[in-house]
Amino acid sequence: MLSPRASVYDAGALPALTEEVELTQALIRNACVNDGGTNVSELPNADLMLAILDGTTADIEYFDAAPGRRSVIARLPGTDSTAPTLMLLGHTDVVPANPDAWQRDPFGGEVVDGFLWGRGSLDMLSYVATMSLAFRDYAAQGIHRGGDVVLALVADEEALGSQGMGWLQEHEPD
């Protein structure tokens, strides 16, 4: 049986941080905090994702459900319109953090002893980074058999979702 630390990313074993870790750090440092109020913005993370996907063969759209509430949808059309679609779904907002309750800056994105510290590093910015880079790299291959592959990076998951996935379901169901 593996110990809980057996699968920990060992930053010291690599000559430099991976692109996935660096992108996750950038997403954390953007501090797209969603406290459920009106002064919320996922624009920094959404715009960073748009920059990552720029230049791919994907059909890329973004939707602003409200000022600052941007969701990004990228689609790679498949070769079989009857095949199921694969959706990679993530959210770009995080819940608030009380800095006094943290051992490190919750929005510092530091790697210390092989651990990435930061609000959203697990839920769900590391997944957003990894999925986005995998999608970008898959798009670069230029071979898209089967059904469509969709990357959906939504705003407002941490509160009600009404300005993220809920808004997309109502206004952009395709």
Where are the predicted features?
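N-terminal helical capping/dimerization or prosegment-like subdomains
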Residues: 2-99
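Predominant activation on well-ordered alpha-helical scaffold segments within soluble catalytic domains
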Residues: 25, 50, 129-136, 166-169
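Short alpha-helical patches at coil-to-helix transitions and adjacent helical residues
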Residues: 46, 124-128, 162
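Structured beta->alpha junctions
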Residues: 64-66, 120, 157
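Active-site catalytic pocket residues across diverse enzymes, especially alpha/beta-hydrolases
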Residues: 78, 138, 142, 172
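Active-site metal-coordination/substrate-binding segment of hydrolases
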Residues: 83-152
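Histidine/acidic-residue-rich, glycine-tolerant segments that coordinate divalent metal ions
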Residues: 146-174
